[in-house]
Amino acid sequence: MNYTTALPDFIEMQRVSFCWFIAQGLNEELNTFSRIYDFSQNTEYVLFGQEYSLVKPIYNIVRAKKYTANYSAQLVIPLEVRNKKTNIIKYHSKFPIINLPLMTSSATFVINGCERVIVSQIIRSPGVYFEKNKHQKKNKKIRKLISSEIGKLKSFTPPSEILPTESRLYFLKPTIKKKLISDKKKKIRFIKKEEYWNWKGESLNIYSFKQIKDYEIDFSTSFVEHFKVYNDLFKIRHLSTKIKRIKIFLKWLACNNKFSLPNKKHLIFLLINSFNLLSRTIVKYKILKTRNNENKNDFILNDYNQIKKVYDQVLQESETLLSLNINTQILSFILRDLEKFNQLNNFNFLKLNITPKIKVIIANDKIKSSLYFTNSFKELIKFKYNFTKKEKDKKRNQSQATIFKNKTKYLKTKSKIIQYKDDHLIRDIYKKKYEEKELYTATLIPEYGSWIRFGFQKNTKINISKYPIKNQEDEIIIQLDKVTQKPIIHLLKEMGVTDLEICQNLQNSEFFYFNKPILTNSIHQPNKLLRFNLNKNYYKNISEFSRIFDPSYYRLGKIGRSKLNNRLDINLSKRITTITYEDIFAIIDKLITLSTAKQISDDIDHLKNRRVRSVGELLQNLFRIGFQRLLRKLRSQTNKTYSSQLSSFNIVGATIKEFFGASQLSQYMDQTNPLSSLTHRRRISGLGPGGFDRDRISFAVRDIHPSHYGRICPIETPEGQNVGLIASLTTCARVNESGFLETPFWRVINGKVIKNRNPIYLTADIEDFYKIAPADISTNQENYLTKNLIPVRYKQDFLTVTPSEVDFIAVSPIQVVSVAASLIPFFEHDDANRALMGSNMQRQSVPLLLPQKPIVGTGLENQIALDSGMVINAQRAGIVESVTANKIIILEDSGRHYKYDLQKYQRSNQETCINHRPIVWEGEKVKSGQMLTDGPGIISSELSLGQNVLVAYMPWQGYNFEDAILINERLVYEDIFTSIHIERYEIEIDRTAEMSEQTTNNIPNLSISDVQNLNEDGIVTIGTFVKPGDILVGKIIPKDDSEQLPESKLLRAIFGAKAKGVRDTSFRMPEGEYGRVIETLTFNRRTKLAYKFEKIQIFIAQIRKIQVGDKIAGRHGNKGIISRILPRQDMPFLPDGTPVDIILNPLGVPSRMNVGQLYECLLGLAGHKLNRRFKILPFDEMYGPEVSRILINKKLRQASIENDEAWLFNPYSPGKMVLLDGRTGKEFDNPITVGNAYMLKLIHLVDDKMHSRATGPYSLVTQQPLGGKAQHGGQRFGEMEVWALEGFGASFTLKELLTIKSDDMQGRNETLNSIIKGQPIPTSGVPESFKVLVQELRSIGLDLSTYRIDEFSSNQSYEIELNLIEKYNPLLKTFSHTSNINNISF
């Protein structure tokens, strides 16, 4: 077996998918909806889905196409309707639910007589994907000037609000035990139930008492605490509360700073830095106290300047201050009473004599340290007591009573204290682990249901007392759409999961829980949890988020389950297709792990994360939607009769009809030629329901991905806005049962390619784990790799390894590209953009009358012709018994006769001609699957889309400027580029109740020659050649009496004339169309007396020769328009006298970089001279460097020797030859590249584009002529054309174009009238588009008025307002007189 040409069945994907749907998919859906209940739950509909049957179609495929019907089978299911209360069966019978369109053997559907294709869809695979947030704000580090402690403090304190409100001021009960820790410099007591700790020390990474003992700790007042408190006091708007709060704060501050502490230089430095903020607060407070002052502004300015001056001075002297041993703190000035404070004229406390003053203040101040000002619940509750040796015993006796007595001094309510155990202190690991995390988002894509997102979110609404975790800025939320979201723990608790369960199921539980939750509802404590101390009533109402666990709303499917198991390392059964708690826990864990480990997020464009939904699965989803609609309809119907309820089953059929008729994925089949129809069925679309939206999609999705190798073609994709969203399957790719794309490879073991078995198909995710060599690696006869170093792909990267390390090798060089691209010879020498155009333009090639097989091909032509569906293949082996133009009869081995009907001159969807020509003869033995006929663009079993013509690359009198093409008249006379096009005209007979049209050949006021080609029924006879204006169907309609004048009625009454007049409403051939009638079809409706025509179809065949304006192209993206047809004698000719057929511009090659066309035309010339054809596979470097060039040179040399024509090969300029000018007979100056290229005629024919308009329809709103040939529109005089006229100053021409020739309604009517009467053309008015603009501006609230400016005179206004919109004077409110002329509208 030659492995390079052994390709799979090209439309296997579609056929297998539909067969799966009929056999299995349909069954699955019918089982899901086997029992349906109505609204009252009394009536039950039982569908016996296992026993469904398909009734044979009424029309076969040929008849369905001919009579514009559907090729569909009736789906019949036994249905039972019974009343549940009474248990009475109302109905039990086989019920026809829908007409299911059936797939033809060539993977198409016949809907309304047209062949349609269901394009496969590529979508994101169900599963979970983790993505790094693109716009993550990085935490800004505080400048190092403020010392390293600030960074620690910042990460340590929460970002939430800190206000001295009741709920955040906490006290101790008198029963608490005490423990003393001695220190050399001072004694500090820690109050401890199970554990307490004062976090205000300088070493912020200490979390246990053991560590405290090892350090000498100074429990000084924290700057951050002051800073945060002041910051929040600023935010209070209500003045009286602000004053109260500041008072409380000042008193508390006084308590905390009672004792002078040893000097700490960094502390002073920190406080100096915060001084600016504090000074502003003081000024504000002063203003509050003195707000009745008259000279308030002066006071503020004066005072602020004074403070600012001091502040600046302090900054300057900071170094001096730090060098002195100041045993104090700068903040102590706030300790004074506010009255005293206001009296201070200068800041004496900054001087060195501050210590005695502090002592005085302390002596006067009687406030005890009864108030603890906490930042949030998350800090460990602490109180600080300082003792001297003398006071120790006295204080010990009094302290408990004092605390208890004073604890409610400033509070109205009591607050509970949350207690902790020693062994569950916040650990250093938490801070290290989550401080530097990166934010990720997880997206869970179910097979059915909306996407679910999990992500980190800053908790802005956090209630401090309920969230006591250090550094907990983010929480994980679950999001169903852009609006609905909630914290994930809320959802789990809603569903009844206890905290202990949550904590035990999460590996990263410390992200949520700062100690291990004890069982809830404990006797001693209502809730041991720290973070989720929420009101229990909150969990009583279950939200819509609980739906994610409901299979009727969200379903993962088998694929989603296996993907989830693999990605999250969980081991759930594949039968569990719903989302479970275990999935949620695993996703949370993975999300936290990724954010801390900072791993690479998933590549959503990798093919392992995208799957293909073929016809079968799309239809299965459609059935599900249909049955769900039925369910809703039956449940919404109450008190309906049972027969009307049965009729509501039609909704399923309507859903199917809607999909085949209107869905983005159901497309009108491209039948231009066999290749276009084949590639259309192999197309993969990213658009459609559940897919991408082409307006919002990024470049990353459209781009080529390494995993596309051998699965999706990197070349064939549309140009324009769909680029990259619509792709094509490669030649060898197939879709596996899960919907993932696979491609074949040969196994390589120890450097030997194993080819004796079938190739191994690998999916994209498995392929990443192996080292895979490309197909263009040469092997010897024993299939061993010959090179020492082999380039391989491994994990989407390129490596070079030894042959023994290679695991797989690609099957074929054309494995990478699609069917259309694989037809381009030498395409490795073309730029990718041009190869893309080449593969797209081959699909637009028109099947020619006399096509030729390409001299230079690639070897796929036969396979494409076979799988295209445009030829007839033998169903079984046998012997041909008879062959005619219309049918082939084969005697099978079993003795049965099998008749094959050939299509003769049938119209395709693109109006090209489908015609079968038999290629077998009587008595020939045929095998199963063998081609019996040729089709359009197929000659002797090979795809032949164009013609081999002699091409020269040279300029010729400027006629090939800008890709224009010169052709020889031989191409016209010898019908080389002639094609047949079949057009269908549909004429409907109007049969209204009063006046019915009749078809007849007896039409009044026509000569015999006008009606001689009509039959008795008035229909044109087959074989007639019709020209524009010829009658196709003769129709008349009787004139109504009401239309007649009274005089004629009187005359009829006097003379007794009974005959009424008739009006001619015949259908005539449109302008610019011509051709021969090849078929007429009539659609009848039987009445009591006779058949009456309802609709008549007439098929007309045109033979179109090539002409100026037609588009032709090569296979390498070298397209052009024919600019001139030259006589043979004027064309340049070869030394042997052969004139060139086509002249192309040589400038089209270097900039386009499609050098493949030169290789093709030169090898084509050699093949033409040697009478030999070549099949060239791409990527020839495997045989040696520059093999293509060597092959061509050798073949040209061989041709020149065999034909004894030395001019064919010049070793000094190979491929170029001397040409002679046909007009003069002289040689051209330089040798010219000449060769046989394969050229295609494209469907963009000038006959279809030619269009003219005199008068025609106008747009309703703008009153401008419509655009386009279909609307009989005009040519748009666009912006650039207006610039051209403006540049020449042609103002009158411009005015004419913008008004009377366009949208000045009154002006154009008056102009026509004056032209008819021979009067001068009147002045133009205001264009309608200007009026529309005025109205649009008014609709958004801008009143734009228009004025007429008259000659200036002092006694009257020279500006008169005009109303352009309505024809009346707005001042008089009376309608103005309209023009005398009659309005003539077109």
Curated annotation (Swiss-Prot):
Show the CDD domains listed in the entry: RNA_pol_B_RPB2
The subcellular location is: Plastid, Chloroplast
Q: Which domain of life is it from?
A: Eukaryota
Protein function = DNA-dependent RNA polymerase catalyzes the transcription of DNA into RNA using the four ribonucleoside triphosphates as substrates.
Indicate the family of this protein: Belongs to the RNA polymerase beta chain family.
Quaternary context: In plastids the minimal PEP RNA polymerase catalytic core is composed of four subunits: alpha, beta, beta', and beta''. When a (nuclear-encoded) sigma factor is associated with the core the holoenzyme is formed, which can initiate transcription.
Q: In its UniProt entry, what is this protein called?
A: DNA-directed RNA polymerase subunit beta
